[in-house]
């Protein structure tokens, strides 16, 4: 288990402005004030583990004696040897600050600020992985991001990494959602072929979409009809 704490986070104001669909003006000036007050509350950190795949199956892999079940993992990691399960968070303080505001627009802006901070921290972590392990290209998958890797798979993923709560303060609730809310988890893996989980997700109105839906590729992971 390795911990990076803190992960430096410098918010990209252009990205934030785009996600808020705002133009320069009075309202944007108010957002900049929120950014200034929010910045000290962002405490980005990550815990991860370097794992070598012990067993490979059509519907998953085994890491450190623990099986992860997902046909997407089974296929995407078929040629992989080493992978990096991780949990990353920006901590609870920004989320707690959001509750102190009564106006919806302020709460919404702080929520988006948190999202941008989380994405920024994740990108920074990815670059650190590439540099440390001399990797050119990487892709990632996370439990709950696709039907083919359901959210209850968070539990074995956390078990593989170790004591995530002691390391960075992230826990799972009974629905396998992470606390603090602004946290992400998954597996990074080296790849020669660019891949985004978005390619397998049909949701059309997702504001976080990074790649177009690939219906043909997604069909490969649909449950097969076994009736005769």
Report residues per predicted region.
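Short C-terminal domain-edge/linker segments immediately following a structured domain
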Residues: 115-121, 202, 217-221
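Conserved active-site and cofactor/substrate-binding residues in soluble primary-metabolism enzymes
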Residues: 29, 33, 116, 120, ...
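Short terminal or interdomain "cap/linker" segment that borders an active site or interface and mediates
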Residues: 136-210, 219-228
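Conserved mixed alpha/beta catalytic, RNA-binding, or beta-rich assembly cores of soluble enzyme
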Residues: 77-142, 146
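Metal/cofactor-centered catalytic core regions of large enzymes
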Residues: 71-75, 205, 210-213
């Amino acid at each position: 288990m390795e911990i990076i704490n803190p992960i430096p986070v410098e918010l990209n104001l252009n990205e934030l402005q785009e996600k808020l669909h705002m133009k320069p003006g009075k309202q944007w000036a108010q957002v900049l004030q929120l950014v200034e007050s929010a910045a000290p509350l962002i405490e980005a950190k990550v815990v991860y583990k370097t794992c070598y795949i012990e067993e490979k199956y059509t519907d998953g892999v085994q890491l450190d004696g623990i099986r992860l079940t997902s046909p997407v993992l089974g296929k995407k990691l078929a040629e992989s040897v080493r992978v990096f399960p991780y949990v990353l968070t920006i901590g609870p303080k920004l989320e707690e600050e959001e509750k102190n505001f009564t106006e919806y627009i302020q709460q919404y802006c702080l929520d988006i600020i948190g999202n941008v901070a989380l994405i920024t921290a994740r990108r920074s972590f990815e670059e650190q992985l590439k540099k440390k392990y001399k990797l050119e290209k990487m892709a990632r998958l996370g439990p709950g991001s696709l039907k083919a890797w359901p959210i209850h798979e968070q539990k074995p993923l956390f078990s593989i990494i170790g004591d995530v709560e002691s390391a960075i303060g992230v826990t799972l609730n009974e629905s396998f959602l992470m606390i603090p809310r602004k946290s992400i988890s998954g597996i990074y893996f080296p790849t020669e072929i660019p891949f985004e989980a978005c390619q397998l997700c049909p949701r059309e109105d997702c504001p976080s979409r990074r790649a177009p839906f690939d219906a043909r590729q997604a069909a490969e992971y649909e449950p097969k009809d076994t009736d005769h």
